[in-house]
């Protein structure tokens, strides 16, 4: 009996972890002119309201988490500065 209860609780915990996974939303723009690239953030801690710092073609921007994968979070270890990016 105890092993059945444990199995159910384990399954519930695993499904909760999977369902609570959050992602960056799919970017709206698929391309960007180099002169328009701007980083509003370089890591999640630069964002407010538990938003994610997401990499997009026109720079890094804070977005509310999405339940569906499609975007890409900024690597917090990557070299990054906020503001306009000049090439």
From Swiss-Prot:
It comes from the Eukaryota. Expressed by the venom gland. The keyword Endoplasmic reticulum does not apply. One of its GO terms (cellular component) is extracellular region. It is found in: Secreted. Keywords: Antibiotic, Antimicrobial, Disulfide bond, Secreted, Signal, Toxin. GO terms for molecular function: toxin activity. Residues 1-20 form the signal peptide. InterPro entries: Elafin-like_sf. Its main location: secreted. Residues 21-66 form the WAP domain. Contains 5 disulfide bonds. Disulfide bonds join 24-54, 32-58, 41-53, 42-80, 47-62. One of its GO terms (biological process) is defense response to bacterium. Has antibacterial activity. Belongs to the venom protein 11 family. 01 (wap-1) subfamily. This is U14-lycotoxin-Ls1b.
